[in-house]
Amino acid sequence: MGFQKPPGTQDFLPGSVERWQFVESKARDICRRFNFREIRTPIIEATELFQRGVGEATDIVEKEMYTFTDRGNRSITLRPEGTAGAVRAFVENKLYGEPDLTKLYYIGPMFRYERQQAGRYRQFHQFGVEALGAVDPALDAEVIGLGYMFYKEIGLSGVTVEINSVGTPAVRAAFRGELLGFLNPIRGLLCKDCQARIDRNPLRVLDCKEDQHLFEGAPSILDSLDEESRTHFEGLQRSLTDMDIPFTINSRLVRGLDYYTHTAFEYKAAGIGAIDTVGGGGRYNGLVADIGGPDQ
């Protein structure tokens, strides 16, 4: 009996590897222009890092992580995303002691136990950037602009940018009650995943593709923003406009991770299949402190 690659993985053979090298070289070139420096972290991390950083009530932590107990009886997880490991390295190696803003990027494999479908793999490659040490919304715009330029330079046409503000933890706590008031009467109409999310992480319900038709008339988190969050979001929009980055506001865009504050964004590309989101991210003001570092 011969061996086959595990489900949800790919072999990259001569011919396809050259295309990967082209994409990676474009990513590195753009990062150099924006003064981001490369970081390489382990593909395994302590499971608690993702539980604390990504959020225990997220789909990633609840259903998608590859986790095992090693011979030292430690719970270890193959990294499902790059931010938590990059921030862990930032804290552990005390990069926050540097006088300037820390701007990092990484390229590498990530692992999630995804349901097999077109465009979804259990081992996938991620290019990400992290900018730590500044609260200016112009930095959020710079990160969004870097990604937008990357897609243009690799030849991906028709890319659009969607943005939202998810506010501060206090804003989300207040909005949570308002949203539950809308969702509870239609709970029985929601898909099984959303019914499970309502009590633990109701904002994630708004991200559901299957139930979007039920959310007409849902409250908007933008109406709940405090002055700090509103000022930050307005500053982001001005900076994107100054950079000639076209964008639309999507008040239901919340992303699937718990660490975001203020800015959330996604890149969409038409004509690439059923899954049109090709990238995304956001700001995470509290993540460094959550992982044991100083407030950033």
Predicted regions and their residues:
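TRNA-recognition modules of translation machinery and tRNA-sensing kinases, especially anticodon-binding
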Residues: 1-296
